[in-house]
């Protein structure tokens, strides 16, 4: 990626972690349709590989603003996709895709991090991977830890996530009939792919 700074990429990962970790509340729903968010999306679209995914997400948000009971409908989508059985869902856990659920724990230890007691989900939840990537990008921007060490850990995290993210995204696209979380997951997929190629 060429136009986004490490801090901006960190912010995108943190934002996505938040949206995949729990249902949107009224404040978040208002925020994603705000002018400030439109500016943020414009910035993301300045990165050519992200443009199509951001456009898709913006279209879903525009449709969302005229959807009756939008928050309740999105909550139902979230629950159906991420909290039910895996038969017609996209469970946001590495272990649901036959991946080593201990890998993220090792990566967190290597980064000097641990999961928060406030987050009542297993450590292999998608949001944990995204929070770790956010932390690593912020650390790259600060320059307090050698960049080579952070970059190595970032690549390991991206590789571990890439083992199951495409299948997760495919399931989001298959089972999210409204399309908000499908569009969000597509943006994440493209972001991770770009980040992974930016060695």
From Swiss-Prot:
Keywords: Chaperone, Cytoplasm. It comes from the Bacteria. Transmembrane segments: none annotated. One of its GO terms (biological process) is protein complex oligomerization. It holds the Pfam family Nitrate_red_del. InterPro entries: Chaperone_TorD, DMSO/NO3_reduct_chaperone, HscB_C_sf, TorD-like_sf, TorD/DmsD_chaperones. Belongs to the TorD/DmsD family. TorD subfamily. HAMAP family: TorD. One of its GO terms (cellular component) is cytoplasm. Involved in the biogenesis of TorA. Acts on TorA before the insertion of the molybdenum cofactor and, as a result, probably favors a conformation of the apoenzyme that is competent for acquiring the cofactor. This is Chaperone protein TorD. It is found in: Cytoplasm.
């Amino acid at each position: 990626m060429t136009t986004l700074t490490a801090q901006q990429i960190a912010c995108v990962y943190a934002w996505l972690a938040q949206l995949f970790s729990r249902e949107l509340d009224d404040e978040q729903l208002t925020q994603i349709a705000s002018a400030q968010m439109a500016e943020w999306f414009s910035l993301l679209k300045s990165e050519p590989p992200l443009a199509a995914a951001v456009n898709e997400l913006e279209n879903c948000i525009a449709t969302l603003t005229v959807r009756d009971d939008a928050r309740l409908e999105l909550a139902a989508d979230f629950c159906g996709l991420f909290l039910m059985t895996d038969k017609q869902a996209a469970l946001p856990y590495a272990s649901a895709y036959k991946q080593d659920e201990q890998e993220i724990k090792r990566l967190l230890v290597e980064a000097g991090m641990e999961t928060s007691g406030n987050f009542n989900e297993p450590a292999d939840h998608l949001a944990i991977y995204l929070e770790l990537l956010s932390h690593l990008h912020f650390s790259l921007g600060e320059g307090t830890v050698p960049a080579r060490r952070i970059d190595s850990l970032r690549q390991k995290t991206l590789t571990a996530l890439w083992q199951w993210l495409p299948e997760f995204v495919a399931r989001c696209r298959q089972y999210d009939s409204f399309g908000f979380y499908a569009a969000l997951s597509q943006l994440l997929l493209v972001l991770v792919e770009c980040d992974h190629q930016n060695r």
